[in-house]
């Protein structure tokens, strides 16, 4: 599955907001699949984009 597909799936299931979806689509081109997946998992649990990004960078890197 691609990064964009993962992001769209989370949005379609209403796990992330429209704003988070749009931001993640732009963000995906700069980061690895593992980074994006970690961010999506954290945002599904209620973390903000910025907090999820910091956690993903610390956890899996860029």
Annotate each language-model stretch with its function:
Residues 1-62:
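Arg/Lys-rich, low-complexity, intrinsically disordered basic segments
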């Amino acid at each position: 599955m691609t990064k964009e597909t993962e992001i769209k799936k989370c949005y379609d299931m209403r796990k992330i907001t429209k704003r988070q979806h749009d931001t993640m689509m732009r963000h995906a081109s700069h980061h690895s699949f593992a980074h994006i997946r970690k961010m999506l998992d954290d945002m599904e649990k209620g973390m903000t984009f910025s907090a999820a990004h910091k956690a993903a960078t610390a956890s899996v890197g860029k």
